[in-house]
């Protein structure tokens, strides 16, 4: 693992980067993994270990800045902002900087680039869907809701837990049901905890639901990685 320090405007931003340990055909896949509010890149790397589950990928775990949320109105803890338009949002600019550096170092491509995130980081994934859809091949938000962002039809792997009391499951369910309708998805079947959908154009969505709480569902990682690989 190495740590990048990037100048984004007048702010130094950090991200923790795992290089591929396994060769892939073509450009290496790239995953940006966004922690929840109050977290950091190192902790989410230890928690979900996407770099171990998908060793052929470049996996970047960025650090957020102190950010106001409903649960942290003073903005004392780090997270991600998606309430501002891209031109004034430091986090969107940080994403651009990471994507540019990854392209320069690893020859990554948007068609093989993915964003995942948990809680506040999952909400940020939905914001990227709305404001930077062409930079990503697919998204994997966890414990979040975001259909209000209304981005274009894109592949999604959504993780939700029925006993989540921070982002209540009924609100997450309303969000992904809205996305299913908007993107004209039809159910294709289930595999374990994953329900699969596809639209007439072949764009797919998978929804992983378990009985957990707001904590990240680590058992969702194999399905998430399989979904990413299926898009390459």
Regions found by a protein language model. Give the residues of each.
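A domain-start/cap signature at the N-terminus of enzymes
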Residues: 1-30, 42-43, 48, 57-58, ...
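Structural cue for short, hydrophobic secondary-structure segments
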Residues: 33-36, 61, 116, 158
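Serine-hydrolase catalytic-loop signature spanning alpha/beta hydrolases and amidase-signature enzymes
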Residues: 38-40, 67
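Cap/lid segment of the alpha/beta-hydrolase catalytic domain
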Residues: 63-90
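Conserved acidic catalytic loop of the alpha/beta-hydrolase fold
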Residues: 93-111
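Short beta-strand/loop motif that positions the catalytic acidic residue
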Residues: 158-160, 164
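Conserved alpha/beta-hydrolase "acid-adjacent" motif
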Residues: 165-171, 216-218
């Amino acid at each position: 693992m190495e740590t990048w320090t990037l100048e984004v405007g007048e702010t130094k931003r950090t991200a923790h980067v795992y290089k591929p340990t396994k060769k892939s055909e073509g450009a290496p896949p790239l995953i940006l993994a966004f922690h929840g509010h109050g977290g950091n890149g190192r902790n989410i790397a230890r928690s979900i270990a996407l770099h171990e589950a998908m060793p052929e990928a470049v996996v970047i775990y960025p650090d957020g800045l102190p950010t106001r949320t409903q649960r942290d109105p003073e903005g004392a803890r780090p997270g991600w902002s998606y309430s501002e338009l891209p031109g004034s949002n430091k986090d969107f600019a940080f994403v651009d900087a990471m994507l540019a550096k990854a392209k320069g170092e690893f020859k990554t491509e948007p068609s093989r680039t993915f964003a995942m995130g948990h809680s506040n980081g999952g909400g940020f994934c939905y914001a990227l869907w709305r404001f930077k859809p062409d930079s990503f091949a697919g998204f994997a938000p966890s414990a979040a809701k975001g259909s209000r962002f209304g981005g274009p039809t894109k592949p999604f792997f959504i993780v939700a837990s029925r006993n989540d009391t921070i982002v209540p499951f009924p609100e997450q369910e309303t969000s992904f049901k809205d996305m299913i309708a908007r993107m004209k998805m039809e159910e294709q079947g289930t595999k374990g905890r994953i329900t699969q959908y596809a639209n007439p154009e072949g764009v797919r969505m998978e929804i992983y639901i378990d009985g957990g709480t707001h904590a990240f569902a680590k058992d969702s990682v194999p399905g998430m990685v399989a979904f990413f690989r299926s898009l390459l």
